Amino acid sequence: MATSSFRGGLAMAVVLLPLLLLLALLAPLQCAAAAATCVGLAPAKRRREVISITEFGGVGDGRTVNTWAFRKAVYRIEHQRRRGGTELRVPAGTWLTGSFNLTSHMTLFLARGAVLKATTDTRRWPLVEPLPSYGRGREMPGARYASFISGNGLRDVVITGDKGVIDGQGEVWWNMWRRRTLQHTRPNLVEFMHSTGIHISNIVLKNSPFWNIHPVYCNNVVVTNMMILAPHDSPNTDGVDPDSSTNVCIEDSYISTGDDLVAIKSGWDEYGIAYGRPSSAITIRRVRGSSPFSGIAIGSEASGGVSDVLVEDCSIFNSGYGIHIKTNVGRGGYIKNVTVDNVRMSGVRVAGVRIAGDAGDHPDAHFSQLAVPTVDAVRITNVWGVGVQQPGSLEGIRSSPFTRICLSNVKLFGWRNGAAWRCRDVRGAALGVRPSPCAELATSFAAAGSCSF
Protein backbone atom coordinates (compact mmCIF):
# COMPACT_ATOMS: atom_id res chain seq x y z
CA MET A 1 0.00 0.00 0.00
CA ALA A 2 2.81 2.42 0.89
CA THR A 3 4.58 1.53 -2.37
CA SER A 4 1.40 2.25 -4.32
CA SER A 5 0.98 5.62 -2.62
CA PHE A 6 4.60 6.47 -3.33
CA ARG A 7 4.21 5.60 -7.00
CA GLY A 8 1.03 7.64 -7.22
CA GLY A 9 2.72 10.61 -5.61
CA LEU A 10 5.70 10.27 -7.93
CA ALA A 11 3.45 10.17 -10.98
CA MET A 12 1.62 13.26 -9.77
CA ALA A 13 4.94 15.04 -9.24
CA VAL A 14 6.02 14.21 -12.80
CA VAL A 15 2.76 15.70 -14.11
CA LEU A 16 2.91 18.82 -11.94
CA LEU A 17 6.60 19.63 -12.37
CA PRO A 18 6.30 21.26 -15.82
CA LEU A 19 3.30 23.29 -14.61
CA LEU A 20 5.18 24.47 -11.53
CA LEU A 21 8.16 25.44 -13.67
CA LEU A 22 5.90 27.38 -16.02
CA LEU A 23 4.29 29.22 -13.10
CA ALA A 24 7.74 30.09 -11.82
CA LEU A 25 8.62 31.51 -15.23
CA LEU A 26 5.50 33.64 -15.44
CA ALA A 27 5.45 34.98 -11.89
CA PRO A 28 8.16 37.63 -12.41
CA LEU A 29 6.38 38.85 -15.52
CA GLN A 30 3.08 39.27 -13.68
CA CYS A 31 4.86 41.36 -11.07
CA ALA A 32 6.15 43.59 -13.88
CA ALA A 33 2.66 44.21 -15.28
CA ALA A 34 2.62 47.79 -13.97
CA ALA A 35 5.90 48.61 -15.72
CA ALA A 36 6.36 51.06 -18.55
CA THR A 37 4.33 50.95 -21.73
CA CYS A 38 4.85 52.37 -25.20
CA VAL A 39 1.27 52.11 -26.52
CA GLY A 40 1.10 55.90 -26.62
CA LEU A 41 2.99 55.73 -29.92
CA ALA A 42 -0.32 54.94 -31.63
CA PRO A 43 -3.30 55.01 -29.25
CA ALA A 44 -6.66 53.44 -30.11
CA LYS A 45 -8.79 56.48 -30.91
CA ARG A 46 -12.53 56.66 -30.32
CA ARG A 47 -14.32 57.48 -33.58
CA ARG A 48 -17.21 59.90 -33.82
CA GLU A 49 -19.06 57.83 -36.40
CA VAL A 50 -19.87 54.11 -36.17
CA ILE A 51 -21.21 52.10 -39.11
CA SER A 52 -21.86 48.37 -39.47
CA ILE A 53 -20.82 46.01 -42.22
CA THR A 54 -24.48 44.93 -42.43
CA GLU A 55 -25.32 48.38 -43.84
CA PHE A 56 -23.31 47.42 -46.91
CA GLY A 57 -24.93 44.05 -47.48
CA GLY A 58 -22.66 41.98 -45.26
CA VAL A 59 -24.04 38.61 -44.17
CA GLY A 60 -22.36 36.74 -41.31
CA ASP A 61 -23.61 33.25 -42.09
CA GLY A 62 -20.20 31.69 -42.84
CA ARG A 63 -21.16 31.00 -46.47
CA THR A 64 -21.80 34.35 -48.13
CA VAL A 65 -18.64 35.94 -49.54
CA ASN A 66 -18.54 39.51 -48.20
CA THR A 67 -15.58 40.92 -50.14
CA TRP A 68 -17.71 43.47 -51.97
CA ALA A 69 -19.41 44.56 -48.73
CA PHE A 70 -16.08 45.26 -47.02
CA ARG A 71 -14.69 47.09 -50.03
CA LYS A 72 -17.85 49.23 -50.30
CA ALA A 73 -17.67 50.09 -46.61
CA VAL A 74 -14.03 51.15 -46.83
CA TYR A 75 -14.77 53.15 -50.00
CA ARG A 76 -17.54 54.99 -48.15
CA ILE A 77 -15.18 55.82 -45.24
CA GLU A 78 -12.47 57.01 -47.61
CA HIS A 79 -14.66 59.19 -49.83
CA GLN A 80 -17.11 60.56 -47.24
CA ARG A 81 -14.73 61.37 -44.43
CA ARG A 82 -16.12 62.34 -41.04
CA ARG A 83 -14.28 64.54 -38.57
CA GLY A 84 -12.72 62.23 -36.00
CA GLY A 85 -12.80 59.21 -38.31
CA THR A 86 -15.17 56.27 -38.68
CA GLU A 87 -15.45 52.87 -37.01
CA LEU A 88 -16.51 49.93 -39.17
CA ARG A 89 -18.12 47.48 -36.78
CA VAL A 90 -18.31 43.77 -37.52
CA PRO A 91 -20.99 42.18 -35.29
CA ALA A 92 -21.12 38.61 -34.03
CA GLY A 93 -21.22 36.07 -36.84
CA THR A 94 -18.89 34.37 -39.30
CA TRP A 95 -17.93 36.73 -42.09
CA LEU A 96 -16.32 35.03 -45.08
CA THR A 97 -14.42 37.42 -47.34
CA GLY A 98 -11.58 37.86 -49.76
CA SER A 99 -8.76 40.31 -49.20
CA PHE A 100 -9.49 44.01 -48.74
CA ASN A 101 -7.67 47.26 -48.00
CA LEU A 102 -8.26 49.70 -45.15
CA THR A 103 -8.08 53.49 -45.33
CA SER A 104 -6.84 56.31 -43.12
CA HIS A 105 -8.66 57.54 -40.00
CA MET A 106 -10.68 54.36 -39.56
CA THR A 107 -11.16 51.61 -37.00
CA LEU A 108 -12.03 48.03 -37.90
CA PHE A 109 -13.82 46.71 -34.78
CA LEU A 110 -14.57 43.00 -34.33
CA ALA A 111 -17.29 42.45 -31.74
CA ARG A 112 -17.28 39.50 -29.38
CA GLY A 113 -18.33 36.46 -31.38
CA ALA A 114 -17.29 37.98 -34.70
CA VAL A 115 -15.07 35.78 -36.87
CA LEU A 116 -13.60 37.28 -40.02
CA LYS A 117 -12.65 34.35 -42.26
CA ALA A 118 -10.41 34.50 -45.30
CA THR A 119 -11.69 32.68 -48.35
CA THR A 120 -9.87 29.46 -49.21
CA ASP A 121 -10.44 30.04 -52.93
CA THR A 122 -6.92 31.10 -53.91
CA ARG A 123 -8.24 32.41 -57.25
CA ARG A 124 -9.86 35.27 -55.34
CA TRP A 125 -6.50 36.56 -54.08
CA PRO A 126 -5.02 39.37 -56.20
CA LEU A 127 -1.30 39.67 -56.86
CA VAL A 128 0.80 42.67 -55.85
CA GLU A 129 4.32 43.77 -56.63
CA PRO A 130 7.20 42.39 -54.53
CA LEU A 131 8.59 44.65 -51.82
CA PRO A 132 11.45 46.79 -53.17
CA SER A 133 13.68 45.85 -50.23
CA TYR A 134 13.24 42.16 -51.12
CA GLY A 135 13.39 42.37 -54.90
CA ARG A 136 11.05 39.40 -55.32
CA GLY A 137 8.52 37.43 -53.36
CA ARG A 138 9.98 35.98 -50.18
CA GLU A 139 9.21 32.43 -51.31
CA MET A 140 8.94 32.64 -55.09
CA PRO A 141 10.34 35.01 -57.76
CA GLY A 142 8.03 37.71 -59.02
CA ALA A 143 4.77 38.98 -57.57
CA ARG A 144 3.22 37.93 -54.28
CA TYR A 145 -0.33 37.40 -53.10
CA ALA A 146 -1.94 40.45 -51.49
CA SER A 147 -2.30 40.27 -47.72
CA PHE A 148 -5.74 39.45 -46.33
CA ILE A 149 -6.08 42.89 -44.68
CA SER A 150 -3.72 45.58 -45.89
CA GLY A 151 -3.07 49.28 -46.21
CA ASN A 152 -0.54 51.43 -48.07
CA GLY A 153 0.31 55.05 -47.34
CA LEU A 154 -2.17 55.32 -44.48
CA ARG A 155 -2.38 57.33 -41.25
CA ASP A 156 -4.27 56.64 -38.04
CA VAL A 157 -5.63 53.12 -38.51
CA VAL A 158 -6.93 50.88 -35.71
CA ILE A 159 -7.79 47.19 -35.81
CA THR A 160 -9.32 46.20 -32.48
CA GLY A 161 -12.32 44.56 -30.90
CA ASP A 162 -13.79 42.61 -28.03
CA LYS A 163 -11.81 39.40 -28.60
CA GLY A 164 -13.11 38.99 -32.13
CA VAL A 165 -11.19 36.66 -34.44
CA ILE A 166 -9.45 37.01 -37.79
CA ASP A 167 -9.00 33.50 -39.23
CA GLY A 168 -6.71 33.22 -42.25
CA GLN A 169 -7.75 29.59 -42.90
CA GLY A 170 -4.16 28.95 -43.86
CA GLU A 171 -4.30 25.19 -44.26
CA VAL A 172 -4.83 25.40 -48.02
CA TRP A 173 -1.73 27.60 -48.35
CA TRP A 174 0.39 25.46 -46.01
CA ASN A 175 -0.49 22.40 -48.08
CA MET A 176 0.52 24.17 -51.30
CA TRP A 177 3.86 24.97 -49.67
CA ARG A 178 4.32 21.38 -48.52
CA ARG A 179 3.45 20.00 -51.96
CA ARG A 180 5.63 22.61 -53.68
CA THR A 181 2.75 23.79 -55.84
CA LEU A 182 2.93 27.48 -54.88
CA GLN A 183 3.11 29.83 -57.86
CA HIS A 184 3.65 32.98 -55.78
CA THR A 185 4.59 33.93 -52.23
CA ARG A 186 1.79 33.29 -49.74
CA PRO A 187 -0.26 36.19 -48.35
CA ASN A 188 0.29 37.71 -44.92
CA LEU A 189 -2.70 38.05 -42.65
CA VAL A 190 -2.27 41.79 -41.90
CA GLU A 191 0.21 44.08 -43.65
CA PHE A 192 0.71 47.85 -43.62
CA MET A 193 3.17 49.64 -45.93
CA HIS A 194 4.42 53.24 -45.80
CA SER A 195 1.97 53.97 -42.99
CA THR A 196 2.07 55.73 -39.63
CA GLY A 197 -0.05 55.54 -36.51
CA ILE A 198 -1.10 51.88 -36.72
CA HIS A 199 -2.75 50.28 -33.66
CA ILE A 200 -3.70 46.57 -33.44
CA SER A 201 -5.16 45.23 -30.19
CA ASN A 202 -7.66 43.03 -28.35
CA ILE A 203 -8.36 40.48 -31.07
CA VAL A 204 -7.28 36.96 -31.96
CA LEU A 205 -5.35 36.18 -35.14
CA LYS A 206 -5.22 32.54 -36.17
CA ASN A 207 -4.12 30.31 -39.02
CA SER A 208 -2.33 32.91 -41.12
CA PRO A 209 -1.23 31.68 -44.55
CA PHE A 210 2.20 33.28 -43.99
CA TRP A 211 3.38 36.00 -41.57
CA ASN A 212 0.66 37.28 -39.23
CA ILE A 213 1.39 41.00 -38.75
CA HIS A 214 3.84 42.69 -41.11
CA PRO A 215 4.38 46.45 -40.77
CA VAL A 216 6.88 47.39 -43.48
CA TYR A 217 8.27 50.91 -44.11
CA CYS A 218 6.06 52.09 -41.23
CA ASN A 219 6.40 54.43 -38.25
CA ASN A 220 4.60 54.46 -34.89
CA VAL A 221 3.10 50.97 -34.75
CA VAL A 222 1.49 49.40 -31.66
CA VAL A 223 0.56 45.73 -31.24
CA THR A 224 -0.85 45.07 -27.78
CA ASN A 225 -3.11 42.63 -25.91
CA MET A 226 -3.13 40.21 -28.82
CA MET A 227 -3.43 36.45 -29.13
CA ILE A 228 -1.77 35.07 -32.26
CA LEU A 229 -2.16 31.35 -32.94
CA ALA A 230 -1.14 28.80 -35.55
CA PRO A 231 -0.17 25.11 -35.36
CA HIS A 232 3.50 24.48 -34.67
CA ASP A 233 3.79 22.63 -37.99
CA SER A 234 2.40 25.56 -40.02
CA PRO A 235 5.26 26.90 -42.17
CA ASN A 236 6.51 30.50 -41.77
CA THR A 237 3.60 31.73 -39.66
CA ASP A 238 5.67 34.35 -37.80
CA GLY A 239 3.75 36.32 -35.19
CA VAL A 240 4.84 39.96 -35.64
CA ASP A 241 7.55 41.00 -38.13
CA PRO A 242 8.48 44.71 -37.99
CA ASP A 243 10.31 45.31 -41.26
CA SER A 244 12.22 48.50 -42.13
CA SER A 245 10.05 50.26 -39.57
CA THR A 246 10.66 52.63 -36.65
CA ASN A 247 8.99 53.21 -33.30
CA VAL A 248 7.29 49.83 -33.01
CA CYS A 249 5.76 48.66 -29.73
CA ILE A 250 4.80 45.00 -29.20
CA GLU A 251 3.41 44.40 -25.70
CA ASP A 252 1.29 42.19 -23.46
CA SER A 253 0.56 39.50 -26.05
CA TYR A 254 0.51 35.70 -26.30
CA ILE A 255 1.90 34.14 -29.48
CA SER A 256 2.07 30.46 -30.41
CA THR A 257 2.87 29.85 -34.08
CA GLY A 258 4.87 27.74 -36.50
CA ASP A 259 7.80 30.16 -36.73
CA ASP A 260 9.41 33.06 -34.85
CA LEU A 261 7.13 34.79 -32.35
CA VAL A 262 8.64 38.17 -33.23
CA ALA A 263 11.23 38.72 -35.99
CA ILE A 264 12.71 42.14 -36.72
CA LYS A 265 13.71 42.57 -40.39
CA SER A 266 14.93 45.26 -42.80
CA GLY A 267 15.29 43.86 -46.31
CA TRP A 268 17.04 41.05 -48.11
CA ASP A 269 20.61 41.12 -49.40
CA GLU A 270 21.40 43.50 -52.29
CA TYR A 271 17.79 44.71 -52.46
CA GLY A 272 17.69 45.64 -48.79
CA ILE A 273 21.10 47.29 -49.03
CA ALA A 274 19.97 49.39 -52.01
CA TYR A 275 16.66 50.35 -50.40
CA GLY A 276 18.53 51.28 -47.25
CA ARG A 277 15.69 51.61 -44.76
CA PRO A 278 16.54 50.30 -41.27
CA SER A 279 14.39 49.08 -38.42
CA SER A 280 14.98 51.00 -35.20
CA ALA A 281 13.40 51.88 -31.86
CA ILE A 282 11.66 48.51 -31.47
CA THR A 283 10.25 47.55 -28.04
CA ILE A 284 9.11 44.00 -27.26
CA ARG A 285 7.72 43.76 -23.73
CA ARG A 286 5.71 41.19 -21.78
CA VAL A 287 5.32 38.81 -24.71
CA ARG A 288 4.75 35.14 -23.91
CA GLY A 289 4.64 32.17 -26.22
CA SER A 290 6.01 29.06 -27.85
CA SER A 291 7.42 28.25 -31.27
CA PRO A 292 9.36 25.45 -32.96
CA PHE A 293 11.83 28.15 -34.04
CA SER A 294 12.72 31.37 -32.20
CA GLY A 295 11.08 33.26 -29.40
CA ILE A 296 12.52 36.68 -30.22
CA ALA A 297 14.54 36.99 -33.44
CA ILE A 298 16.43 39.69 -35.28
CA GLY A 299 17.01 38.87 -38.93
CA SER A 300 18.01 37.11 -40.88
CA GLU A 301 16.76 39.63 -43.48
CA ALA A 302 18.41 42.69 -41.91
CA SER A 303 20.26 44.25 -44.83
CA GLY A 304 18.93 47.75 -44.16
CA GLY A 305 20.17 47.63 -40.59
CA VAL A 306 18.58 47.06 -37.17
CA SER A 307 19.30 49.18 -34.11
CA ASP A 308 17.96 50.28 -30.74
CA VAL A 309 15.98 47.20 -29.81
CA LEU A 310 14.64 46.57 -26.30
CA VAL A 311 13.34 43.15 -25.29
CA GLU A 312 12.20 42.84 -21.68
CA ASP A 313 9.96 40.86 -19.34
CA CYS A 314 9.25 38.07 -21.84
CA SER A 315 8.56 34.36 -21.34
CA ILE A 316 9.44 31.76 -23.97
CA PHE A 317 8.67 28.06 -23.66
CA ASN A 318 8.67 24.97 -25.86
CA SER A 319 10.76 26.65 -28.55
CA GLY A 320 13.74 25.93 -30.75
CA TYR A 321 15.68 29.03 -29.65
CA GLY A 322 15.04 31.62 -27.00
CA ILE A 323 16.83 34.73 -28.29
CA HIS A 324 18.10 34.45 -31.87
CA ILE A 325 20.11 37.10 -33.73
CA LYS A 326 20.83 35.85 -37.25
CA THR A 327 22.62 37.21 -40.29
CA ASN A 328 24.93 36.03 -43.06
CA VAL A 329 27.60 37.07 -45.54
CA GLY A 330 25.76 38.82 -48.36
CA ARG A 331 23.32 40.49 -46.00
CA GLY A 332 25.42 43.56 -45.28
CA GLY A 333 23.83 46.03 -42.92
CA TYR A 334 24.24 46.06 -39.16
CA ILE A 335 22.63 44.84 -35.96
CA LYS A 336 23.55 47.04 -33.01
CA ASN A 337 22.40 48.45 -29.70
CA VAL A 338 20.24 45.50 -28.69
CA THR A 339 19.19 45.09 -25.05
CA VAL A 340 17.56 41.92 -23.73
CA ASP A 341 16.55 41.97 -20.07
CA ASN A 342 14.51 39.78 -17.74
CA VAL A 343 13.61 36.92 -20.04
CA ARG A 344 12.48 33.50 -18.80
CA MET A 345 12.57 30.38 -20.92
CA SER A 346 11.88 26.66 -20.58
CA GLY A 347 11.93 23.67 -22.90
CA VAL A 348 14.33 25.16 -25.44
CA ARG A 349 15.35 22.39 -27.82
CA VAL A 350 18.42 23.96 -29.49
CA ALA A 351 19.96 26.98 -27.73
CA GLY A 352 18.83 29.59 -25.26
CA VAL A 353 20.85 32.36 -26.92
CA ARG A 354 22.10 32.16 -30.49
CA ILE A 355 23.94 34.89 -32.38
CA ALA A 356 24.83 33.48 -35.79
CA GLY A 357 26.70 34.74 -38.85
CA ASP A 358 25.71 31.85 -41.11
CA ALA A 359 21.90 31.92 -41.03
CA GLY A 360 19.41 32.46 -43.83
CA ASP A 361 19.12 31.97 -47.57
CA HIS A 362 19.61 34.40 -50.46
CA PRO A 363 17.11 35.77 -53.00
CA ASP A 364 19.38 34.96 -55.95
CA ALA A 365 23.01 34.49 -56.94
CA HIS A 366 23.70 38.23 -57.21
CA PHE A 367 24.46 38.91 -53.56
CA SER A 368 27.96 40.19 -52.81
CA GLN A 369 30.46 38.24 -50.74
CA LEU A 370 31.82 41.65 -49.76
CA ALA A 371 28.52 42.60 -48.10
CA VAL A 372 29.58 41.52 -44.62
CA PRO A 373 27.24 42.48 -41.77
CA THR A 374 28.34 43.91 -38.42
CA VAL A 375 26.92 42.90 -35.06
CA ASP A 376 27.85 45.16 -32.15
CA ALA A 377 26.67 46.17 -28.68
CA VAL A 378 24.33 43.34 -27.73
CA ARG A 379 23.53 43.35 -24.01
CA ILE A 380 21.79 40.33 -22.52
CA THR A 381 20.98 40.52 -18.80
CA ASN A 382 18.89 38.69 -16.24
CA VAL A 383 17.96 35.68 -18.36
CA TRP A 384 16.99 32.43 -16.66
CA GLY A 385 15.98 29.12 -18.17
CA VAL A 386 15.44 25.43 -17.49
CA GLY A 387 15.29 22.54 -19.91
CA VAL A 388 17.62 24.37 -22.29
CA GLN A 389 19.49 21.94 -24.55
CA GLN A 390 22.50 24.25 -25.02
CA PRO A 391 22.94 27.53 -23.15
CA GLY A 392 24.30 29.51 -26.06
CA SER A 393 25.96 29.63 -29.45
CA LEU A 394 27.80 32.83 -30.39
CA GLU A 395 29.39 32.36 -33.80
CA GLY A 396 30.42 35.43 -35.75
CA ILE A 397 32.07 35.93 -39.12
CA ARG A 398 35.82 35.50 -39.45
CA SER A 399 36.29 38.69 -41.45
CA SER A 400 33.91 40.63 -39.19
CA PRO A 401 33.83 39.31 -35.61
CA PHE A 402 30.81 40.23 -33.52
CA THR A 403 31.83 42.82 -30.91
CA ARG A 404 30.68 43.96 -27.49
CA ILE A 405 28.53 40.91 -26.84
CA CYS A 406 27.90 41.45 -23.14
CA LEU A 407 26.21 38.92 -20.86
CA SER A 408 25.26 39.50 -17.23
CA ASN A 409 23.35 37.22 -14.85
CA VAL A 410 22.46 34.68 -17.53
CA LYS A 411 21.65 31.24 -16.14
CA LEU A 412 20.49 28.59 -18.57
CA PHE A 413 20.28 25.00 -17.36
CA GLY A 414 19.61 21.79 -19.25
CA TRP A 415 17.94 18.61 -18.07
CA ARG A 416 21.40 17.07 -17.92
CA ASN A 417 24.79 18.49 -17.05
CA GLY A 418 27.59 19.01 -19.55
CA ALA A 419 26.08 21.36 -22.12
CA ALA A 420 28.50 24.19 -22.89
CA TRP A 421 28.56 27.54 -24.63
CA ARG A 422 29.96 27.53 -28.16
CA CYS A 423 31.80 30.63 -29.37
CA ARG A 424 33.78 31.70 -32.43
CA ASP A 425 34.76 35.07 -33.88
CA VAL A 426 33.09 36.98 -31.08
CA ARG A 427 34.33 39.50 -28.53
CA GLY A 428 32.70 40.68 -25.34
CA ALA A 429 32.35 39.86 -21.67
CA ALA A 430 30.33 37.72 -19.30
CA LEU A 431 29.64 38.08 -15.58
CA GLY A 432 27.45 35.81 -13.51
CA VAL A 433 26.85 33.41 -16.38
CA ARG A 434 26.04 29.72 -15.81
CA PRO A 435 27.14 27.35 -17.18
CA SER A 436 30.49 29.08 -17.44
CA PRO A 437 30.78 30.95 -20.74
CA CYS A 438 33.41 30.37 -23.38
CA ALA A 439 36.92 31.81 -23.21
CA GLU A 440 36.26 34.30 -26.01
CA LEU A 441 34.23 36.36 -23.55
CA ALA A 442 36.27 38.31 -20.99
CA THR A 443 35.47 37.96 -17.30
CA SER A 444 35.23 41.71 -16.72
CA PHE A 445 33.40 44.43 -18.61
CA ALA A 446 36.41 46.70 -18.38
CA ALA A 447 38.47 44.13 -20.26
CA ALA A 448 35.82 43.87 -22.98
CA GLY A 449 35.43 47.63 -23.38
CA SER A 450 32.12 49.52 -23.29
CA CYS A 451 30.07 46.69 -21.76
CA SER A 452 27.90 49.01 -19.69
CA PHE A 453 24.81 47.81 -17.83
What would you call each of these model-derived segments?
Residues 2-453:
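Extracellular/periplasmic carbohydrate-active domains that bind, remodel
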